[in-house]
């Protein structure tokens, strides 16, 4: 098995020029000189890698030897330069003004002089051909200048005391490398980018320390592979992500000396045909040692199977838990990637089983027959044990089979629906795999008007135990959820008690899903750009929604309306009546034109899309260009571009693009400048109010305690004179 993309580098230091400075006396001049480094990087070497279902190898090495490029180019050090001949302006006996000085040894300076010193702009040429053009200050290259070597290599940028210091660009003709960025005392240090070939397919952009890649940076290799993360001494070290484009693999996690070591996640992407759908990608998350899976880790297989346990040198070894595609579970000892004991059941078959061991009454489900293969396939075992428990034990197997047959009749459509909704909000994917999330599943339920059967979306989610809208759903889980929802909605309308699960599922498919699926509504997923922009605020909105749910046992439309009032967001554009009409588009039960019901519970998707609706109502149109602040030439250029674009684009597309840009600006303005700042201010005010109230309570308590103590002391003082008199009389 190949190790993961190691990067070797020499520890050779990059010597920088020594400088010599000699002050001139009327007829002598001195100059700082330096030797300039020619930076390079190594070749992008690759070796073969083997990938299999059980043991997937890590990607090849990308060795990066650093050698000849970082050797210095020595420039003569000028210890004492005597002017043999001078041609130019003078002031008295001093060189002053423009002139040409010919130095002993064949060196020449042409440029500005001031009181006998090279000062101002000039050109200095060494006898070996090295040339400096730029600023001089008191005989020293200082400011901005250009070094040019005899072979054509150049440095252009800031110079301090004759050394590259500041921002500059170095081009090496021999190695075709280019560095552009910050320098410190002649060495690459700070932010900079290095291109290692003429095609600019091999480069590094990031932080440098002492001529080495160190800190945070991004490295693109000639093969197209990319690493972005932390570096130390020219090798990957710390947290980082490496993507092997040629192998469709990615590792994200910890690195030590160029090798995957510590905690990390390795993903194997899978290409698929347009009509196929894998549940997920092969992905390992856990411990790595020397680029191998070693220690504790979890492997998610693309088929839906899952292994969680111990690993040793890339193989399952030790105690582990394996969940098969059909939901069966084996827990025990593994040895060299194999189960130490064959499980008591047939892993590839599925009958009336309990796919998840944490379901209630799993022993009953496990006792059912598993000798017959499921018509849906071994990877599509339904998890509806909670519904089967409502059926008499004698009829459970028949009920389960009839549900499977009902699902089988619609399997093609169900797969299309899963693929369609899982791709909402995604423009592209490296592996074309989009696991469905609960947020997308919520959109599917709203599109199919499932919530219009006397049950809210939030109540539906309580039935299937949803804890996060961003959790992925496997196809078998998605179908199981639909069956559970169908039963709770339709079972009262089914007269016969026989095959009731299949009847409820078929009714929901016929009345709701088939006519309405894939007709996307709402503010979030109606356009890919809408989702791309809005999802930037989903995490923060989820935090706010959770906080509101904690504050209220049930978060309803009424609480949402009052929240906007507390945040002082209502104005002429955003009013309560407009808000209610917007919310009732997806949920007609909120407002039927005459009556309003504000006590309906809101799910997170409804909450998030309600915020997006508020952004549309409240947002003002933002112009892309402010013509009052744009000069005439730029206006003419913009006008010509607009005319050219209009010629290529139809009026309908131009209008749609304008509307889309307007929506993006309004959404960003609402969240960044209105809603989120107002909510954060409200939280701070509440915290400060609570703190002040707590301080007031504390002070009041202290005052009561002090008063009580004073009263006790006063009661004690009334007895003190008697005691004193007694003592005095004794004396």
From Swiss-Prot:
PANTHER family: RADIAL SPOKE HEAD 10 HOMOLOG B-RELATED (PTHR46613:SF1). Residues 18-36, 46-57, 363-377 have a biased composition (Low complexity). Gene3D superfamilies: Histone H3 K4-specific methyltransferase SET7/9 N-terminal domain. The gene is rsph10b. The keyword Protein transport does not apply. May function as part of axonemal radial spoke complexes. Radial spoke complexes are important for ciliary motility. GO terms for cellular component: 9+2 motile cilium; cilium; cytoplasm; cytoskeleton; sperm flagellum. InterPro entries: MORN (IPR003409). MORN repeats lie at residues 86-108, 109-131, 132-154, 155-177, 179-201, 204-226, 227-249, 251-273, 284-306, 307-329. It is found in: Cytoplasm, Cytoskeleton, Cilium axoneme; Cell projection, Cilium; Cell projection, Cilium, Flagellum. The keyword Transferase does not apply. Its main location: cytoplasm. This is Radial spoke head 10 homolog B. Pfam families: MORN (PF02493). Keywords: Cell projection, Cilium, Cytoplasm, Cytoskeleton, Flagellum, Repeat. Residues 7-17, 722-731 have a biased composition (Polar residues). Residues 1-69, 353-377, 709-731 are annotated as: Disordered.
